[in-house]
Amino acid sequence: MFTRRGFNIDALTVGETESPEYSRITISLSGDGYAREQLINQLRKLINVKKVEVLDDDCIKRELMLVKIENKPENRADIHFAVDAYRAKVIDYTNEGMCIEVTGDPSKIDAFIKLMIPFGIIEMCRTGIVALDRGTSTLLSKE
């Protein structure tokens, strides 16, 4: 459906919810308001879709990234300084490389990547965005 209609999806995340009978799909896409409305209309036509909601820009959103960085002795202090500054975690450490976990909004993840490029990124993987509205209302309680 997405390819046929020309939607440009930036990220797609699927996971469990508080209700075992439902999964939540978070779609992050770029495009104009018309493309967004077309996507919403197409999703609402699908039988298995319970609810479609567009979240406000001030919603709570997070992304997870794992990134492997070259572990050169001359760069270790600077890398660890960046890890601390970004509240990241070193989750694996060898003589050749280290794997760092970073969680935050997408702009934080992007900034961390730019900071790590000079040290040598070996490999990286991003989860895509997960998001919730602020407050106590839920997606299903808004019906």
What are the functions of these language-model segments?
Residues 1-143:
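A conserved regulatory-domain signal marking ACT and ACT-like small-molecule sensing domains
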